[in-house]
A protein has these predicted regions:
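N-terminal accessory/interface modules of nucleic-acid-binding and processing proteins
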Residues: 1-276
């Protein structure tokens, strides 16, 4: 067990170095993070390291509770848990590695065109009216701008305290703030676009994330990753709640329609039989 724990600690360190090495690696990580936005940065990093295409991870008791079982032979995704005695491991499994004997599925929210207006309205209620309402993508980009402006300050203060020894050390405070804020905003927007089914490469290129190279120590990258993960989660949870509410309303209406149709059919049959 200790050997496994050590290997996961080293894996986290290795992936930390990899995603800060270039913008391509970093964007690949952001794609995984988008589908696992409820996890913190370290968990996202380890999910990316072990199963980069994971889209819905949970512990085995969650899957069992919802009538699903983990496929035999599946290796869990090991995550680190802080304790008073150091780290311990816990394991999560992606939904793609589970099945249900009863054919039960768990709804994973998906953005659909018919939901967009309601989602935009929900975001405006939280983050203010958008100057550009031309589409969902424009509203997500504006949301990222507003929410980062409101929340990046505390993370920046932490970053100033640990930037010594990194490439950021060569920058003055204004440049550090500008680079950090811009990178967080682009990263949050990238995650939101990705999770909402919009190709982020229509709005970003590798150059937008080039400064990740300067976050070349575990401390600086941890603050960057923590800021991005924490800030992106807020609007995405709101979007998820809105979309799932709309989806469940549709399901109820469909069931009601089906029940009424069945009732009308049954009543019609009864009348016909009586007339015969």
């Amino acid at each position: 067990m200790a050997k496994k724990l050590d290997s996961i600690v080293e894996l986290a360190a290795q992936k930390t170095r990899e995603i800060s090495a270039n913008s391509g690696n970093y964007m690949a990580f952001l794609t995984t993070a988008a589908h696992n936005f409820k996890y913190d940065f370290r968990d996202q990093l380890l999910i990316y390291a072990q199963k980069p295409d994971a889209t819905a991870c949970a512990q085995i008791d969650f899957w069992n509770k919802h009538g699903r079982y983990v496929n035999r032979g599946t290796r869990g995704i090991a995550l680190l848990v802080d304790t008073d005695r150091g780290y311990k491991l816990r394991y999560v499994f992606d939904m793609s590695d589970t099945n249900s004997r009863q054919g039960r599925t768990i709804p994973i929210w998906k953005m659909e065109p018919r939901y967009e207006d309601t989602v935009i309205e929900a975001l405006e209620n939280s983050y203010g009216e958008f100057p550009d309402r031309s589409g969902l993508a424009a509203c997500l980009l504006e949301t990222a701008k507003v929410i980062v402006e409101d929340n990046f300050g505390d993370y920046y203060t932490e970053l100033r305290g640990v930037k010594a020894g990194s490439l950021l050390e060569e920058l003055d405070d204004l440049s550090t703030e500008t680079w950090f804020k811009g990178l967080v905003e682009s990263s949050v927007a990238f995650i939101m676009l990705t999770r909402c089914g919009i190709d982020p490469m229509d709005y970003f290129s590798g150059e937008d994330f080039a400064h990740v190279y300067d976050f070349d120590t575990p401390e600086t990258l941890s603050i960057l990753g923590g800021a991005v993960s924490d800030i992106a989660e807020m609007p995405l949870r709101e979007i998820a709640t809105t979309v799932l509410s709309l989806y469940r309303t549709e399901q109820r209406e469909n069931r009601t329609f089906d029940e009424n149709s069945d009732r009308q059919y049954h009543d019609g049959r009864t009348k016909q039989e009586r007339s015969v």
